[in-house]
Amino acid sequence: MTFEPIGNPGNAPDTTGSPNPAGSVGYHYNMGKYEVSRDMINKANAVGNLGITLNDMTSFGGNGANRPATGVSWNEAARYVNWLNTSQGYTPAYKFDFQPGQPGYSALANITIWQASDPGYNSANEFRNSQAKYFLPSMDEWYKAAYYDPSANGGVGGYWNFPTGSDSAPTAVSGGTAPGTAVYGQPSAQGPADITNAGGLSPYLVMGMGGNVWEWEETESDLVNNSPSSARGVRGGDWSNNSFLLSASNRFFFNPSSEDSLFGFRVASIPEPSSAVLLTLATVGLWQRRKRSS
């Protein structure tokens, strides 16, 4: 899975889109460069016994391995993210009552809320464990990666209306990687493009945040993240939409167990420590060991 760094922590929020304000993030994070593919889900199912179902896209261009994973509910996307974490030794992002292989397990089951007694509890976001490496992007994380441009306004930074670095609608295409293009305005039967062929990039070099398939946000409709059964945000539009639905003005909400051929998702993560940080930590550790031995 390829990630792009999203920097410029503490950027100002946008006050022209939906919701208002949106897009201000006070920390560095990474955004998946591409949407999650069918192949990624199938491999995780085989190894992790996740039981995530994908919609049959035969009537929408086919079930190619590199097509986006569609028909995945928010709850199933959260299961996939948890598997990414636990399979690599990290803390799961989301809390479920039952795990794969246990009696009572269902990939469609709602999460439960992390409690103050749980390591990694974050009162500002009771959905996500702060010790997890991988997670679904929050509303602000998704919005920033799509619409914010640190070089806009003479380097001051600012927001575009579309996730291709422009206030003008992108050129509608069936696929490709040309700048200023997006996969939208296509016949329904065509279906989405492969995840690596899903149009031009955002200012942060992320592909397909406008068109191709709608993407789940981590964040619930009222932005609070304290109700497991509440509707979650989706945004970005799909291959058959008009350009307006790709814009920063549009955010819609669906039940977390909803599965639809138009819905997919991408993954975000925390960055690995930089070499400079690791060198600093190593130097501090060496100094402390020398101090204890002296």
Q: How would you label these PLM feature ranges?
A:
Residues 1-55, 68-85, 211:
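A short glycine-rich, aromatic-capped structural motif
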Residues 7, 14, 32, 63, ...:
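Residue-level detector of conserved, well-ordered beta-strand and adjacent loop positions
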Residues 76-247:
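Functional-site microenvironments in short loops/helix caps that host divalent-cation chemistry
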Residues 260-269:
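Short, structured beta-strand segments at or near domain termini in extracellular proteins/domains
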Residues 291-294:
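Short, charged juxtamembrane terminal tails flanking transmembrane helices
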